[in-house]
Amino acid sequence: ERWMKKNKMKERIMCLVLAVMLGISGIIPTAPVLKTEAASLSAADDSQTVIGCHRLHDTSYAAVQVGNKIYYSSDRTGYIFCYDVKKKTNKKLAKLPKQVRNKNTYYSYKNYANISNMFYYKGYLYCGLMDGLMCYGIIRVNVKNGKVKKLFFECSSSSVLPEPSFEFSIYKNKIYYAYSNGTSNYNYYFASMNLDGSHKKVISQKALTKVCRNVKDSRMIVYRDAVYVYNNFDVFYKINKKGKKTKIKNLPKTYMKVKVSTSGCVIDGEKAQYKGYEYDSMGSFGLLNKKNIATGEEKVINSSSSERRSYIVLGDYILLRKNKAKKKLGECKITLQLLNNKGKKIKDLYSYNVNYNE
């Protein structure tokens, strides 16, 4: 028992050292942007459409469509790529710092690309056993020269419920983000900063903390310049950029409006809707179903009986992540594959081997 306690203490110290190395300096990316919202961010991006729909059954890789370009990242390796659909070129843009690409790192699908030629996304780093720390933050990558900058990094204990929360939005050349911090009794913060991570400002701490602690099973969405707190029932609060709190009625209508505006797709559990079609990934092996909402006609467009599959619906394209087991237990091959919206393969973008025993 003494040996176990000693090892746990060592592990927590290592996590704290890692957090210091990473630097706690503050930001976070949220869901993808629509054309109208992107235009309000930068005049240079008026002609760009950013689409990044709901991920179906996976959280370990990220992708976003910007016009004819697909920006995507791979879990564990830390690489960020750009695939040009028209030119059929696949370019490696950057590799994340060593500290944030260990075997326990994964990246959220909530990301932005081509805002002043920058790619923003959030990553998580789990450190330690069940009582270890969970670190999270926003990484910004210059898509022209591949330079990487950590805009925000925070660590909280993952041993208490609910798990630490971290959400963000980019609106009118500002990043608005909300996060939790603590080890046993979380405090919640709603803050803002510039796109380069400067001028960080806490908008609300007391009001947001009170709401999140009082609303059972609370969750947060950051939409434009406000944070929304909700649960699965009928409690829905909004705190704006001035820190003013209001309670919102008609939860379903408001919630759906926010989700559509921040993702470009209607999100409903493990489903995504885009241009009159509903996509649903079913089963542990990833069976991708496409349904015509108007006619009710549905069809399985991608599936496998021998490997695990998950999908990111990007609109005209779908990014497929295939996880195929090897002969040796714990080893597998990961392949990121681009599909058209009918589920047919366009190209294998990137593949790599993973050993879960390490």
Residue ranges and their predicted role:
Residues 1-4:
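Short, Lys/Arg-enriched N-terminal segments with co-localized hydrophobic residues
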Residues 14-27:
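Hydrophobic helical h-region of N-terminal Sec-dependent signal peptides
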Residues 24-42:
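Sec-dependent signal peptide cleavage junction
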Residues 39-54, 80-101, 136-154, 188-205, ...:
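Surface-exposed loop/turn elements that mediate protein-protein interactions on large endomembrane-trafficking
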Residues 48-78, 116:
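Beta-strand-rich domains and repeat architectures in extracellular enzymes and scaffolds
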Residues 57-64, 108-119, 158-171, 209-224, ...:
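Repeated scaffold domains used in trafficking and secretory/extracellular systems
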Residues 72-73, 126-128, 176-178, 229-230, ...:
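Residue position within the beta-strands of beta-propeller blades
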Residues 76-79, 130-135, 181-185, 234, ...:
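Short glycine/acidic-enriched loop and turn motifs that connect beta-strands
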